[in-house]
């Protein structure tokens, strides 16, 4: 599924990385524990999180995450956005909760990081 479609499903507003809206995404994961993200997430996946710290971006960069969507209208600082822009990492904000975000994407056919539906 294209990143653009995912953002539409989540009613998300892009913050940066608009050039990557045609990115094809196969899997999605949700976590507020960055140690879990580092423990073997799928390259190019979408990360749903409620954390907005700069550590989220650093972790996403190391793990090869394709895009980060902040849930519950959580807005990162300009410093966080600038770091993501420097690595061409798309960021977006969704008004949906983590639960609703996961449910919507599952309903639309997205698979989890383990490939299960």
Predicted regions located by residue number:
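N-terminal, charge-rich interaction modules
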Residues: 1-21
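Feature captures the catalytic cores and cofactor-binding loops of soluble hydro-lyases/lyases
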Residues: 22-23, 27-46, 50-117
